[in-house]
Amino acid sequence: MSPCGRARRQTSRGAMAVLAWKFPRTRLPMGASALCVVVLCWLYIFPVYRLPNEKEIVQGVLQQGTAWRRNQTAARAFRKQMEDCCDPAHLFAMTKMNSPMGKSMWYDGEFLYSFTIDNSTYSLFPQATPFQLPLKKCAVVGNGGILKKSGCGRQIDEANFVMRCNLPPLSSEYTKDVGSKSQLVTANPSIIRQRFQNLLWSRKTFVDNMKIYNHSYIYMPAFSMKTGTEPSLRVYYTLSDVGANQTVLFANPNFLRSIGKFWKSRGIHAKRLSTGLFLVSAALGLCEEVAIYGFWPFSVNMHEQPISHHYYDNVLPFSGFHAMPEEFLQLWYLHKIGALRMQLERCEDTSLQPTS
């Protein structure tokens, strides 16, 4: 929790104490008392504050500048926080080691549904997290429109391990800006439903689309929502049946839940974190160095010129589901302290300073 948050709570408690001293107690109707308790609890959990608007955030970034120096101490400290809260080295994906036969687990996105690991699911898991840890130099690539005409493709592809979000297009028209290399790509079940009709009639189209990701891991939240399990399993079987180069990993719901709690404790209150923040969180726990690209959820770039929402289209997300400005401010803070590097300018215009 931020110092400001603590101060607000202490102030509000002090104010209530003063009011209690000045005014005699009165008996309230039971319904009114219950309502007061609910309101006070809500304000305690979610203290009232005003998030800066888009223009204020952009102006703040411009004033602070994007100059950056790696801070190994800050990076190690945050990696330790990730290890302590969420253990990505062991819990990033479902494995035979962390999800043994017969284990009962809860969907992290639903409170009413659980599932039990049986032979049909256990056989789909790798023995352990299939990465040689720690990963050295990682690039996490979001899909923000700020990547368009960025010239960042070569810099992204220089990373040892590249993570991408939501099966993004990597055709030749984009590679100069976003690169072509991938080691891990996320795929939300909603994409499988909407773009590939749940793989009921378009298995070949799906397999052909996956070829662009070469030997990547396809990381899917099969056990976040009950409705996501079936399409995720279909992806596994489809790629397995044709001997595709890609390997499906299922996100561990305990890991996703822990990441959600971690960021909620730091002020991000959203129905669900974005895929990008989940990936950055994992990278900060798995990688020695982290650089992120395309994490800019605003309608203008650093020169206050209009940009599209994604580098490949301008389709806006559903309002209120993610807390993108809050997420950005948290990542921007990590950039400023040197724990990760956030690329916001054209790559050829950026000169990195040496490690401190």
From Swiss-Prot:
The chain crosses the membrane at residues 30-48. Its main location: Golgi. The active site is at H322 (proton donor/acceptor). Pathway: Protein modification; protein glycosylation; Lipid metabolism; sphingolipid metabolism. It is a single-pass type II membrane protein. Disulfide bonds join C138-C287, C152-C347. It is found in: Golgi apparatus membrane. The keyword Disulfide bond applies. Glycans are attached at N71, N119, N214, N245. The keyword Ribonucleoprotein does not apply. One of its GO terms (cellular component) is Golgi membrane. Residues 49-356 are lumenal. Belongs to the glycosyltransferase 29 family. This is Alpha-N-acetylneuraminide alpha-2,8-sialyltransferase. The gene is ST8SIA1.
